[in-house]
């Protein structure tokens, strides 16, 4: 049994262990990006190759291709490796076109705004 020295511990906790692997990156604004990590720096700025943005609305999803994509480190919330041998999504999810997912996002945003305005109008009733 060997003990991992400081170098091994440092490398296993850094982004170096994810180089050339397919990753899922969750950003502060809620976007989900997928791609292969090609480079990074000390500020966690990262370069994804073959990147795409996965947009999910209800049971519909769309992968919007972005190509080579640079991510500013301060916007990263979470980085995780994708298991290439497992299904990425549950079987009930339906793949749709970019135009369809944009329409679905707009409808969802409008419904959310309507709920917010209704909540403000009913605030005086003090429901919680």
Swiss-Prot record:
Pfam families: LSM (PF01423). One of its GO terms (cellular component) is Lsm1-7-Pat1 complex. Gene3D superfamilies: 2.30.30.100. It is found in: Cytoplasm; Cytoplasm, P-body. Keywords: Cytoplasm, mRNA processing, Ribonucleoprotein, RNA-binding. Residues 10-85 form the Sm domain. Disruption phenotype: No visible phenotype under normal growth conditions, but the double mutants lsm1a and lsm1b show severe developmental alterations, such as delayed seed germination, reduced root length, epinastic, chlorotic and small cotyledons, small and serrated leaves, abnormal venation in cotyledons and leaves, dwarf plants with early flowering, short siliques with reduced seed number and small morphologically alterated seeds. GO terms for biological process: cold acclimation; deadenylation-dependent decapping of nuclear-transcribed mRNA; hyperosmotic salinity response; mRNA processing; response to water deprivation; RNA metabolic process. Its main location: cytoplasm. Expressed in roots, leaves, stems, flowers and siliques. InterPro entries: Lsm1, LSM_dom_sf, PTHR15588, Sm, Sm_dom_euk/arc. Signal peptide: none annotated. One of its GO terms (molecular function) is RNA binding. Component of the cytoplasmic LSM1-LSM7 complex which is involved in mRNA degradation by promoting decapping and leading to accurate 5'-3' mRNA decay. LSM1A and LSM1B are essential for the formation of the cytoplasmic LSM1-LSM7 complex which regulates developmental gene expression by the decapping of specific development-related transcripts. Required for P-body formation during heat stress. Belongs to the snRNP Sm proteins family. Component of the heptameric LSM1-LSM7 complex that forms a seven-membered ring structure with a donut shape. The LSM subunits are arranged in the order LSM1, LSM2, LSM3, LSM6, LSM5, LSM7 and LSM4. LSM1B subunit interacts only with its two neighboring subunits, LSM2 and LSM4. PANTHER family: LSM1, SM-LIKE PROTEIN LSM1B. This is Sm-like protein LSM1B. It comes from Arabidopsis thaliana. The gene is LSM1B.
